[in-house]
């Protein structure tokens, strides 16, 4: 059960802040996007965290297994790269053999995907490859006026020396009935480096 007990620094203002912004701007920002007021399309789901007691269904973030070339994976990488070696639990597939390494000062942003109020949680696998920096996780909401970024959690330097699943992290709040384009961004502060693999979103968990 150690995957649920990682020493994360969670930012509780995220849901309240994004909720206020969304409430004030959703109509103005998204009303012109005809399909904004609707649920996201159904996704193929699995139960990748069942062995840690989490039997919820999750879908893989686009490119979130980090298998293939950088162009096939589609993530925006800066001082980060696809590297050999998968997380050791092989929750996405036994043939997987790659993960993402982010060096100090580097960033990695997922492709934009559709998110709605039924998708508040996400999880992934991580380990600190070399010490010296925190791993910050951000939710980036895309709007016609530019991206809105909120820090979701910070995984502290030294807290994950070996591969493990993270706790359930919160995607910034989305008003019921709306869908928005969002991406997840990982930032390594300071020195050191982190590995990330198999990034999943839970489309069903309530609250």
Give the ranges of each region predicted by the language model:
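Short beta-strands within extracellular/lumenal beta-sheet-rich domains
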Residues: 94-121, 132-134, 166-168
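Sec-dependent N-terminal signal peptides
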Residues: 16-27
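Exposed low-complexity, polar/acidic, P/S/T/G-rich flexible segments that act as propeptides
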Residues: 190-207
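Extracellular glycan-recognition surfaces and repeat-rich motifs
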Residues: 50-53, 59-98
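N-terminal secretory signal peptides that target proteins for export/translocation
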Residues: 1-17
């Amino acid at each position: 059960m150690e995957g649920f007990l990682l020493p994360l620094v969670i930012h509780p203002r995220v849901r309240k802040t994004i909720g206020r912004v969304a409430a004030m701007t959703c109509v103005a920002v998204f009303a012109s996007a005809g399909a904004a007021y609707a649920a996201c399309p159904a996704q193929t789901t699995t139960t990748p965290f069942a062995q840690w007691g989490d039997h919820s269904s999750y879908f893989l973030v686009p490119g979130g297994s980090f298998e293939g070339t950088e162009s096939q994976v589609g993530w925006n990488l800066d001082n980060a790269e696809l590297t050999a070696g998968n997380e050791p639990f092989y929750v996405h597939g036994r043939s997987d053999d790659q993960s993402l390494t982010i060096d100090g000062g580097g960033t990695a942003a997922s492709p934009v995907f559709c998110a709605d109020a039924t998708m508040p949680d996400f999880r992934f696998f991580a380990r600190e490859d070399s010490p010296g920096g925190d791993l910050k996780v951000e939710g980036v909401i895309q709007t016609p006026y530019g991206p809105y970024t909120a820090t979701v959690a910070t995984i502290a330097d030294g807290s994950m020396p070996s591969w493990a699943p993270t706790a359930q992290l919160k995607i910034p709040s989305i008003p019921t009935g709306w869908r928005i384009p969002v991406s997840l961004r990982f930032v390594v502060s300071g020195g050191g480096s982190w590995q990330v693999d198999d990034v999943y979103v839970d489309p069903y968990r309530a609250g």
